[in-house]
């Protein structure tokens, strides 16, 4: 089957920003103007096409990353609309991993918010080229150039306006295109009657000044263009487009556009800019991976290269399990067998679909650069690589943050027990930041996630989709344990109870691993001191012990274990004996490695009238918070701080009381840090008292 669009004319883009910047409305308008939908859906009406889960339509927020295909100017545009709420950061993370370009949406009034910085960092992590749409220019207090300066100052981006608004707030009547050097005036409310016109005379000087800055910045990134610019003082529209595109692809420029998606102004120009400036799959670096030999390799965006794809999302719906994939190379055909190289398992491709939010179009194949979904995969989860059996490769995977908050959950009736188990399995397959465990002391099921809203939504889904009624406990902080020094550990398990005995013996070296590595295992056995068939069980014994820690029963993270020696018995050794020996060696080693307790630290931003600044800072300090920055603008103070999550329960009520109901705050996970000794001792004592 031939391609609908050449690879050069494909754009895989994401629309990302902080909550309430207008991402979903922008996506809706893109779908309306590109002909995918024929009626405009609003988030606040619960009618947005990309918000298709019941909770999304009720709450007016986007929870999951919805993938949609559309076309514009003979280009295929695959769009992922991502959530802005920090509790759903994994949805943004997995989208960034598979995208080629991003439209970052900012509110013209609110500007750069804490979540904007998080999204920007996620795009930086995967080197995703981006452009900016300053939305809500119709709102009172809208200030395009102020937001542009915030992007430069707070995000350290080379933000470059390629448009200027004509008017603002209630008088937004059009947009100046600095590249084409002309104006677009909006003549109807639907945004479909647009008149090209000369730049209004009262804005001539301002437009000329900003166009000169644009030409100067573009020329600086291109030797050929700088010569032309120095000689003539001018660049043509074609030269500017070429220069901006090259600047975006090299991460040297971020073009900034403006408009109001809600008022139907500026969205078609955003689509034009996606086509003109954001990369095709062939414009970005080939994806890197590791061959079975351990050697690094790359896969180019090419239909003729060996097939490789990354599963970036798994969803259960009434039709079965959907696995979203980003095709990096080759062709994937319906009915074929492929390899899950991450799990070393074979998979059959029963059906392939391209999605338009909650509608789907069946296709016979997916090709390099496509975003699509596979039905019928049995073993594949988020972050797994799919590839040809003849050309195995494991692609770079996703960064998955540790959960920070947990609650106990129990079914209301015995009849709900099995349904709860099925629901939790399905939800944890979909969402890698959602973890399920059993408390060994109380035997309660414990679920952990990225925040209270995250867990609230998941519990809501259990009731709606899986018909499970459950009682939920009070939220608890998800502490972690780690080690600070290196040591050796030894575990010998020998039992003789008549007949065949049990024997396993391992010696390990243990040291702190890089942050984010979790549990890292290295086998350095030589000369068969431990036979190959017992190395896996020994490693599994250690990994399982990791889950319950040694200080207070919390999972142990960022530990590197090297298996260096051991011994075995020809008759008495078994997999179980080596699993137990591995666990014993691990516990022995951890105790000697200065184990410490870690707690989730939250990045908190508080806004309040400046009269309350002293009270806000004093209160944050009393919560073991570290104030990292503060500012006062027009009588409004902003305080940025890092505060332990354990100290933030009940903060909303306290802030309202302190600021007479005029303070607001946002909070997101920052990192795990060591708990101060006196606090750690109290937590450890409490947990040991409960056991």
Swiss-Prot record:
It is found in: Cytoplasm. One of its GO terms (molecular function) is GTP binding. One of its GO terms (biological process) is ribosome disassembly. GO terms for cellular component: cytoplasm. It holds the Pfam family EFG_III. GTP binds at residues 17-24, 81-85, 135-138. Residues 8-282 form the tr-type G domain. InterPro entries: EFG_II, EFG_III, EFG_III/V, EFG_IV, EFG_V, EFG_V-like, EFTu-like_2, G_TR_CS. The keyword Transcription does not apply. Keywords: Cytoplasm, Elongation factor, GTP-binding, Nucleotide-binding, Protein biosynthesis. SUPFAM superfamilies: EF-G C-terminal domain-like, P-loop containing nucleoside triphosphate hydrolases, Ribosomal protein S5 domain 2-like, Translation proteins. HAMAP family: EF_G_EF_2_B. Catalyzes the GTP-dependent ribosomal translocation step during translation elongation. During this step, the ribosome changes from the pre-translocational (PRE) to the post-translocational (POST) state as the newly formed A-site-bound peptidyl-tRNA and P-site-bound deacylated tRNA move to the P and E sites, respectively. Catalyzes the coordinated movement of the two tRNA molecules, the mRNA and conformational changes in the ribosome. Belongs to the TRAFAC class translation factor GTPase superfamily. Classic translation factor GTPase family. EF-G/EF-2 subfamily. This is Elongation factor G. It comes from Prochlorococcus marinus (strain MIT 9312).
